[in-house]
Amino acid sequence: VKPAPASKPEVKPAPQATPKAEEKQAPALEQNPQMHVNMGAFDTPHMRGTRSAIMSNINGWRTLTDNMYRSRVLQQGEPTGIWAHVGGGKYSFNGNGVDTDTTYTRIQGGYDAKTGSGWTIGGQVSYLRGNDDYIFNGSGKEKAFAVGMYGLKDLGNNQYIHIESQVGRASNDFTVRNEIGEKLSGETKTNAYTIGARYGKTVKLSNGTYIEPQAQLSYTHFGGDSFNAGSMHVDQSGVSSTVGGLGLEIGKHFGAGNLYTRLGVNHVFSGTVKTTYTSGATTKYTSEDIKGTWTDLAFGGRYGFNANNSIFADISTGLSGDYKAGWSVNAGFTHKF
């Protein structure tokens, strides 16, 4: 068995030790010098970049749907009616070879009203756009869209429950690169849905001050996708995950508004993203465990100009975790006819 000719510059050694001649790896690379999936117990930079794009898409959907934002401000005293909310921020994910940073803008709007049964119910539309950064100057453009319904009810004894469901679609148009700048471009898009519930109890103190422990549980299914990135074919499995959260809010009501600070800890109990990559005659597999814990801190408030018009705003930041919100700023208004 002759070794691969040294005169062909496009033949690059495998990232690990030089393969034995009987493995015949060099001839395979010669036949396809643009191969993006190589034999061995490792993933190539193009595979790693594609994993980053998939994880960014999942985290974009999570950012769009996980906080039950409208129910929270209604609980704090916001009037029902037509409302809109715009926000922006950053989040990152770092783990298992995936390293992503995303800057995003989120817009939500809807309408809600009180019913005779004691529930406040509403419908909403949500949209997110994000720009991703990956290893070796890779990049992605995220888009996520969802429609949903929500409701909240006073259970008595200063207790409440919030419920919400959202269904929509998320996509990521990405370009990934390896160490020498060779790039692959592709687009992954899939359907997703989320349902969740939150329980809280308000402990009223003196002078309008309160303490409010909260517990939240949500379930998300993020669909699978099959797509091409250059000459590499990718099959991503669907993933289902359950997320639980505990929070403690401390605030103060004053006149027509309130101020608060909230500390939260969240944990993903389940979820594995399984992906198959094929380039030429070579196929490899990766399995991404998305279980983990993260914490966040928020400050915010609301103010009512009159019975029909009010504003609300908050700023939050992540404190720890593989999934970490760098910062987020949100503001909105409600108008009641």
Predicted feature locations:
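Cleavable N-terminal export/targeting peptides
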Residues: V1-M35
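Outer membrane beta-barrel translocator domains of Type V secretion systems
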Residues: L29-I211, S316, G321
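Transmembrane beta-strands of outer-membrane beta-barrel proteins
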Residues: I82-A84, I121-G123, V147, I161-I163, ...
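Short, internal active-site loops enriched in acidic
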Residues: G89, L128-G130, S218-T220, G264-H267
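Solvent-exposed, glycine/polar-rich loop segments of beta-barrel outer-membrane systems
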Residues: N96-T102, N137, S171-K189, H221-T242, ...
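Short, well-ordered alpha-helical segments in soluble proteins
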Residues: S171, K201-V203, L217-G223, F254
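Outer membrane beta-barrel transmembrane domains
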Residues: L205, V234-F337
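Short, structured loop/turn "capping" segments at alpha-beta junctions
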Residues: S206-E212, F222-S226, G255-L259
